[in-house]
Amino acid sequence: MKLFKYILFFVCLQINLHAVAENVPTAIQDSLKVLYPSVQTVGWSTDQDYYVAGFQHNGFDMKVWFNNKGNWVMKQTDWQVMDEVPEAVYHTFTFGPYSTDEVLDVTLVEFPKRKSQVVVHLEEDNAETEYQLFYLTDGELINARNVTNLNQILGANTFL
């Protein structure tokens, strides 16, 4: 019975993703091709009033949010580990109060008209408390939010 539920879930998900992909305006698809001409395989979804393109680029998972006019409003690159973060962010994190905690994920978030951010998702050492730390690329920690019992998705609700 569980297997049937999983199969049904994935079939419904595929139908939904296919329906979203068919309804993405041409202007938005063209904008993605201008930004990332080499990307071939794209999964489309929606987040509030935005179309979201998900794909692999240079070995990283990426997502780009587009408004209805075809302008990108947010890009996310899933770095997963601290190896890619700017030196200033690494320094602030390493000498900060969360340095002994386990890093679960690291995401670069870029915007066309405001400063980029690096979000470090971590779990406190010897606890089940999870945080998202929001850094500017110059190393300034601008927010530390407890996400233990919250939706941890970095989407339109978080940034737009």
What are these regions (language model features)?
Residues M1-V24, L32:
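Bacterial Sec-dependent N-terminal signal peptides
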